[in-house]
From Swiss-Prot:
Keyword S-adenosyl-L-methionine included in the entry's annotation: no
Binding site for ATP: K596
Reactions catalysed according to its record: tRNA(Ile) + L-isoleucine + ATP = L-isoleucyl-tRNA(Ile) + AMP + diphosphate
PANTHER family membership: ISOLEUCINE--TRNA LIGASE, MITOCHONDRIAL, SOLEUCYL-TRNA SYNTHETASE
Name by which UniProt lists this protein: Isoleucine--tRNA ligase
Record-listed Zn(2+) binding positions: C888, C891, C908, C911
MF-aspect GO terms: aminoacyl-tRNA deacylase activity; ATP binding; isoleucine-tRNA ligase activity; tRNA binding; zinc ion binding
EC number: 6.1.1.5
Organism of provenance: Bacillus cereus (strain 03BB102)
Keywords attached to this entry: Aminoacyl-tRNA synthetase, ATP-binding, Cytoplasm, Ligase, Metal-binding, Nucleotide-binding, Protein biosynthesis, Zinc
Residue ranges annotated as motif 'HIGH' region: 57-67
Function, in words: Catalyzes the attachment of isoleucine to tRNA(Ile). As IleRS can inadvertently accommodate and process structurally similar amino acids such as valine, to avoid such errors it has two additional distinct tRNA(Ile)-dependent editing activities. One activity is designated as 'pretransfer' editing and involves the hydrolysis of activated Val-AMP. The other activity is designated 'posttransfer' editing and involves deacylation of mischarged Val-tRNA(Ile).
Subunit record text: Monomer.
Positions occupied by motif 'KMSKS' region: 593-597
Length: 921
């Protein structure tokens, strides 16, 4: 008889190798065929809503690791919520207007100057849709479950119409105004930029100290002094109209040789050192407030420079006397306005100096620094020129420096509802908690929001102008434009004359001849995406405002979190979200930013093609995403190893349940052995821990809990000793069916617990599980932890056993290394435990040699009675010897009962009985 044929070895069709790059696309096709998104929505209909609102990625180019991290985190949450009593719709979105798309077309050779704005915009829309399609397929490949057929896209007519409504509502409340004001201006984009569109990079600049002679000392100064200002932007000096000093600071009149200079007293030493003064002495001090309205002379133009008071003046750097050009700085503008200065801005859209800067007209601002400095030297006003490298704002798209420039722009008045904004921030739940402080400070400190852009590709600002120049924004015009956009899209604004965009018969007192013109600026793209709470959450039947959660990268505190908050509070008085969760950036394995120049860019597509989407998703679950995270081939290799462990666990469980019918073979909990019930306690602990971790968005805790359960609780303990019973006993042996009962519960629970993270693998496992009826694991709920009556007692006892078992395993390892035994089944062990452990061991009814995976187990005396040479551990001394007897051909146990049964002389007594009862006819 071939005894190996009498062993119940694992049997399953579930493949050992994942082969995810091939298998996942097939699974996704299956999901598409069964309409999994709709099925889940149908299955969860009527439950409370949980809305995670998707912040729209920009529709340009392939998705990068930041996109992958973001969408996968969202998918974890949505999938988990739909398995825990919620209906969790997920509507993906795309941000589709803005400069990058214009640039992409220009780079493709589109000659925009040879076509109308409307024609160019049509090409922009086509390009945007292509990009949406490209990114949609890549997001789907990640396994993200969403309403992919009905996303929201900011260029769609219905969306644009709602955005116009948001603008109109804000205008109606008086929050929208037109003003001349310095804004971030990008000469390379020829447009104003929002704060969210700038980034800081190092830049080399001229650092100059300039003397402004006093013209009128107002009886405070004698008239022969000179104010010293410091600037790193010499090109703004043609726009200088004043000097700001701090009212509370003390200023010193310093005599150096025959000259007298005015600087802040506390900067005396620094300035003296910088300007290499020798024999400098302070001849007089005055308070800043006394210098108000004194007048200096512009160094190279025949005009005055008024001395004004400003709280923005600091002693961090410079001289305490600040060069003030209202056309080129926020603080300068505010101070200048207070003192009635004009807003002089002699720089055009392209960054070129105009005729208002005589002697320098026609020069690009950056190229004007040198001739201006030379002019200062020529007139004797230049005291010092050096070069410094400092952090300077750049256009985030063109990567070129930007300037502050006063232009006529449309603004949303943040000041008008700042208090409500701050209240909304306080009412929101922030994860991490520092997010609240970050947004609070931004809202507290930010100026009014410049919402106009001088570009073509965007949503037009729906304003008309009367013949007398009055802007027209009324309910009637707003509703009419919104209706036109809903029907024709916003291109209609560029295709029709102003009169054809106004309601029929529209009149206005400022236009006696019935003539109107329309605004040509478009809205900041942050106004587009910032209106999604109205255009998507409020408008779609399957969603609601406020959303439960917004989840984006930490750069969105100044971006989408901020713009959405501003428009929502302005329109509804409330935040558009109940909670905000942010994640960090993806860095390479060494913690460096990914960049083409370093060549360290990791692309999601490559990972999915080589390893699979579930490996990428498992990586997302493994990292502390609230900070910056790292990815590299080595890191992915470790994650792939963990995946292999999880997959092998599934395969082992399935293989040993091949002959298990839950309806017939399940053993009641009360009839299970203690060790089996202990395993159920461990499973329930896992369920509780994993669900708590999902609830708090702590996916790394889910990852570690599942990995540890598979390796420590299952592989190293339960499954390890269970093999002897599963393979060796007869199919219906009560211990075997008891273990299978536990394995079945473990398998079903584990499959559900990993579903949000590993949906492809979970749905691959699901149909192999005996007795399941649902088409997909996604149509089930998370497992419930079942509290066993004796759970605490079981835990106390068996946790103690596990620590003692660790001691035994160490002793067996030593014996193996010393060649006392080959494998652990060759061993006979005698334990000399502590009193506590002895009591515990004596209370165990299970076969201890099976639990220790040895052939013979004996309980000796107490620990102190152990032989002197026996290795002693924390809980027991262990004597390991070679077991006596022969090795059974069938179960490999060493036994003295081999050959007792004449018909089966190579088998031990136990195996002979099993074979006779189950396999001998």
């Amino acid at each position: 008889m071939e005894y190996k044929n009498t062993l119940l070895m694992p049997k399953t069709e579930f493949p050992m190798r994942g082969n995810l790059p091939k298998r996942e696309p097939a699974m996704q096709e299956k999901w598409a065929e069964m309409n999994i998104y709709e099925k889940v929505q149908e299955h969860t209909k009527g439950r409370p809503l949980f809305v995670l609102h998707d912040g729209p990625p920009y529709a340009n180019g392939d998705i990068h690791m930041g996109h992958a991290l973001n969408k996968v985190l969202k998918d974890f949450i949505v999938r988990y919520k739909s398995m825990t009593g919620f209906c969790a719709p997920y509507v993906p979105g795309w941000d589709t207007h803005g400069l990058p798309i214009e640039q992409a077309l220009t780079n493709k050779g589109v000659k925009r100057k040879e076509m109308t704005v409307a024609e160019f915009r049509k090409l922009c829309a086509e390009y945007a849709y292509e990009q949406v399609e490209r990114q949609r397929e890549q997001f789907k490949r990640l396994g993200v479950r969403a309403d992919w057929d009905n996303p929201y896209i900011t260029l769609e007519p219905a969306y644009e119409a709602q955005q116009i409504k948001v603008f109109g509502d804000m205008a109606k409340k008086g929050y929208i105004y037109k003003g001349q004001k310095p804004v971030y201006w990008s000469p390379t984009s020829e447009s104003a930029l929002a704060e969210a569109e700038i980034e800081y990079q190092d830049k080399k600049s001229a650092s100059i100290y300039v003397a402004f002679p006093v013209k009128d000392g107002k009886n405070v100064l004698e008239g022969d002094e000179k104010y010293i200002i410091w600037t790193t932007t010499p090109w703004t000096l043609p726009a200088n109209l004043g000097i700001s000093v701090h009212p509370e600071l003390e200023y010193a009149i310093v005599k150096v040789n025959d000259e007298k200079y005015i600087i802040a007293s506390e900067l005396f030493e620094t300035v003296a050192k910088t300007l290499e003064w020798e024999n400098a002495e302070v001849v007089k001090t005055v308070k800043g407030s006394e210098l108000e309205y004194t007048v200096a002379k512009h160094p190279f133009y025949d005009r005055d420079s008024l001395v004004m008071l400003g709280d923005h003046v600091t002693t961090d750097a410079g001289t305490g006397c600040v060069h003030t050009a209202p056309g080129h700085g926020e603080d300068d503008f505010v101070v200048g306005k207070k003192y009635g200065l004009e807003v002089l801005c002699p720089v055009d859209d392209k960054g070129v100096l105009t005729e208002e800067a005589p002697g320098f007209e026609g020069l690009f601002y950056d190229k004007a620094n040198k001739p201006i400095t030379e002019k200062l030297e020529e007139v004797g006003a230049l005291l010092k020129l050096t070069f410094i490298t400092h952090s300077y704002p750049h256009d985030w798209r063109t990567k070129k420096p930007i300037i502050f420039r006063a232009t006529a722009q449309w603004f949303a008045s943040i000041e008008a509802f700042r208090k409500e904004l701050l209240e909304a921030v306080a009412e929101t739940k922030w994860v991490p908690a520092w997010g609240e402080t970050r947004l609070h400070n931004m809202v507290r400190d930010r100026g009014d929001w410049c919402i106009s852009r001088q570009r073509a590709w965007g949503v037009p600002i729906p304003v008309f102008y009367a013949e007398n120049g009055d802007p027209i924004i009324t309910d009637e015009t707003i509703n009419h434009v919104a209706d036109l956009f809903r029907e024709h899209g916003s291109n209609v604004w560029f295709e029709r004359e102003a009169k054809d965009l106004l309601p029929e018969g529209f009149t206005h007192p400022g236009s006696p001849n019935g003539e109107f013109r329309k605004e040509t600026d478009i809205m900041d793209v942050w106004f587009d995406s910032g209106s999604s709470h109205q255009a998507v959450l409020e408008e779609r039947d399957d969603l609601q405002r406020p959303a439960d959660l917004y989840l984006e990268g930490s750069d969105q505190y100044r971006g989408w979190f901020n713009s959405s908050l501003s428009t929502a509070v302005a329109v509804t008085g409330k935040a558009p979200y109940k909670g905000v969760l942010s994640h960090g950036f993806v860095l390479d394995g060494e913690g460096r930013k990914m960049s083409k120049s370093i060549g360290n860019i990791v692309v999601p597509k490559k990972i999915m093609d080589q390893l699979g989407g579930d490996i990428l998703r498992l990586w997302v679950s493994s990292v502390d995403y609230q900070s910056d995270v790292r990815i590299s081939d080595d890191i992915l290799k470790q994650v792939a190893e963990v995946y292999r462990k999880i997959r092998n666990t599934f395969r082992f469980l399935l293989g040993n349940l091949d002959d298990f019918k839950p309806s017939e073979n399940t053993v009641a909990v009360a009839e299970l052995r203690e060790v089996d019930r202990y395993m159920l306690v461990k499973l329930n602990d896992l369920i509780t821990k994993v669900k708590e971790a999902y609830e708090t968005y702590d996916f790394a805790a889910v990852y570690h809990a599942i990995h540890n359960f598979c390796t420590i609780d299952l592989s190293s303990f339960y499954l390890d000793f269970a093999k002897d019973i599963l393979y060796i006993e007869g199919a219906n042996h009560e211990d075997r069916r008891a273990i299978q009962t536990v394995l079945y519960d473990v398998l079903v629970a584990l499959t559900k617990l990993v579903t949000p993270i590993l949906p492809h693998t979970a749905d691959e496992v699901w149909p192999y599980i005996p007795g399941v009826t649902e088409e997909s694991v996604q149509l089930t709920d998370m497992p419930e932890a079942v509290q066993l009556d004796d759970a605490e007692a079981l835990k106390t006892k068996w946790d103690a056993f596990m620590t003692l078992r660790d001691d035994v395993l160490k002793a067996l390892e030593v014996a193996r290394n010393e060649k006392v035994i080959g494998k652990s089944l060759n061993a006979s062990i005698t334990l000399y435990p502590t009193a506590e452990m002895k009591t515990m061991l004596e209370s165990i009814n299970e076969d201890l040699k099976q639990l220790f995976i040895v052939s013979e187990y004996k309980l000796g005396g107490m620990m102190e009675e152990a032989p002197a040479d026996a290795p002693k551990y924390e809980h027991t001394a262990v004597v390991v010897a070679q077991a006596t007897g022969e090795t059974c051909e069938r179960c490999w146990v060493v036994s003295e009962t081999i050959g007792k049964d004449a018909e089966h002389e190579t088998l031990c007594e136990r195996c002979a009985t099993v074979v006779k009862e189950n396999y001998v006819k």
